[in-house]
Amino acid sequence: MARVNHKLVKQRLNEKRSKITDRQFFTSRLFAGHLEDLAAAQTRRYHYNRRVRVNIYWNSKDSFFAATDNMSVKINAGHPFITKTKGRENRYQIILGVFAHELGHILYTDFLAGQTHHNYLGAHKWYPYPPVLATSADARRENAFWEYVKEDPKNLEMAQYIADYISNVIDDGYVENRMLANFPGKLGYGLEELRQVHFEDIPTVTQLIEKEDTEGRHIFESIAQIMLSYAKYGEIKYGEEPLSEERIQVVFSLINDIDTALMSRSGKERLVVIN
């Protein structure tokens, strides 16, 4: 495989748009190779010998942002979250941060455990093992849960969706903490830039409640967003809401569990918290 000319990447990064557009630069094979080489150099310490492939495209109308399948990373550089940032260098840092986040999932997310958890739930079983039922009320709630998921296939689908969503929220916080601790250089700096922009974008609890009224959003979406804010940043943007507000109280009741999951290096143990 031909080596990537990283000096040329830096040159193109500083070129005026009249010579090369952001779309041309960020979707070029040169830039994708630059990220692939960066990942290879950074992950060598983990004896991670498989080359991470990068696919970057540009579509401002596509709601897809970024994802990994544990083999490759796909990023939509034309997503409004990226293009609202002005300047090619600034956009480069955001895309680098997005790549660092997805690379974090490749390095630290237990994809097999996550899929097994999903499949077990589909078979009406807990994975890796049942939650601790400390009280008779806990036992009643567990029985009610299984009755609910067995009642209708759509109920099971919803339970799996919620479990997968919460698992991803926890993993987002976990992998970013690991990336920031282990890669303080180029990848860490890009991730910090991304986190700053993302945190500014997170709505307050007051705004989330307003969206429930104006956009018909479910209260779970608000609670999940508050959980994400805490899991990633250790902060909740309350807005004008008191600490007694029900959504805030739900997340407060889960903080010990969230902290336990964020500190666990075992993907299976994080799934126990999800249960």
What kind of feature is each model-predicted range?
Residues 184-275:
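Pan-zinc metallopeptidase signature
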Residues 1-212, 228:
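Basic/hydrophobic alpha-helical interface regions
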